[in-house]
């Protein structure tokens, strides 16, 4: 593995972790954000179409791409709703942990990914680490009873719903063996359709939607870097490195967006995201 390949493999985490930061920075609310983000992803998809990466000779790729893209839009829209309630730094560690748990459980139960005792043992350790890491990143502030906070409770429910969309996006491709640049155009079309449907009954503005195009473009470029890095550094390594997005988004929420945390919460966040990343590395190497 060359050092340059390793640096490129880090870029998906940087790009994907920046998506929600830019969404919140430019504002507009979750419905403008999801419509703009999905249209931005479609711009990248159209670029792939123009350059000949989109193939129309495989109906499975087309159908799975469209459906999985719509599922991603559903997951992202609900994640943005949670962010509007409790902020980026509270949402992203929990969302990342839920996604890892959800995709892992589905893959183990329905796809039989853990076939040896060693995989089962290390997999269970990783799951325990994930739950622990998420709990640490969600520590309440001093004199704060977070469990009695109605917005926090509502956000957790929304994140569970969001996770269903994200897990569906990932596992659908695994089930049918669909992925890579061949599927990205059709996924981006599904995302744009999903984003439009999810926002069509809500007030949106052209300006706010346009400002939120950038996060979608960044998401799509992050995918391209992921596809490039997988054959260079391996699927397990590229997957593990991509989960560093939780560090980018969580710390970006605190230091860039100014979400306030006390010393106890900051300690929990630092330790929690390290534990989540360790768990992601373990899970990545079990694939």
From Swiss-Prot:
GO terms for cellular component: plasma membrane. The chain crosses the membrane at residues 7-29, 34-56, 58-75, 114-136, 156-178, 183-202, 209-228, 233-255, 267-286. Keywords: Cell membrane, Membrane, Sugar transport, Transmembrane, Transmembrane helix, Transport. The keyword Transmembrane applies. SUPFAM superfamilies: Multidrug resistance efflux transporter EmrE (SSF103481). Its main location: membrane. It is a multi-pass membrane protein. GO terms for molecular function: carbohydrate transmembrane transporter activity. It is found in: Cell membrane. PANTHER family: TRANSMEMBRANE PROTEIN 144. Involved in the uptake of glucose. Belongs to the GRP transporter (TC 2.A.7.5) family. This is Probable glucose uptake protein GlcU. The gene is glcU.
């Amino acid at each position: 593995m060359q050092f340059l390949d390793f640096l490129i493999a880090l870029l998906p985490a940087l790009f994907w972790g920046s998506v929600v930061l830019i969404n919140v920075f430019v504002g507009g609310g979750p419905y403008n954000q999801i419509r703009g983000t999905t249209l931005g992803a479609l711009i990248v998809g159209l670029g792939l179409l123009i350059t000949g990466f989109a193939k129309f000779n495989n109906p499975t790729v087309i159908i799975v791409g469209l459906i999985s893209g719509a599922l991603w839009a559903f997951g992202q829209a609900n994640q943005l709703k949670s962010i509007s309630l409790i902020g980026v730094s509270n949402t992203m560690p929990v969302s990342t942990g839920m996604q890892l748990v959800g995709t892992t459980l589905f893959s183990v139960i329905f796809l039989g990914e853990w076939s040896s005792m060693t995989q089962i043992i290390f997999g269970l350790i990783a799951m325990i680490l994930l739950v622990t890491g998420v709990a640490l990143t969600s520590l309440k502030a001093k004199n704060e009873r977070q469990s009695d906070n109605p917005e926090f409770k509502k956000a957790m429910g929304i994140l569970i719903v969001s996770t269903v969309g994200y897990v569906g996006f990932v596992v659908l491709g695994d089930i049918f063996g669909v992925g890579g640049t061949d599927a990205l155009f059709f996924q981006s079309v599904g995302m744009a359709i999903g984003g439009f449907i999810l926002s069509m009954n809500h007030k949106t503005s052209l300006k706010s939607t346009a400002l939120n195009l950038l996060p979608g473009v960044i998401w799509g470029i992050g995918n391209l870097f992921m596809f490039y890095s997988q054959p260079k550094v391996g699927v397990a390594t590229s997957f593990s490195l991509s989960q560093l997005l939780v560090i980018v988004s969580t710390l970006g929420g605190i230091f860039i967006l100014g979400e306030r945390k006390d010393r106890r919460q900051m300690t929990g966040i630092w330790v929690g995201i390290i534990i989540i990343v360790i768990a992601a590395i373990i899970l990545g190497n079990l694939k």
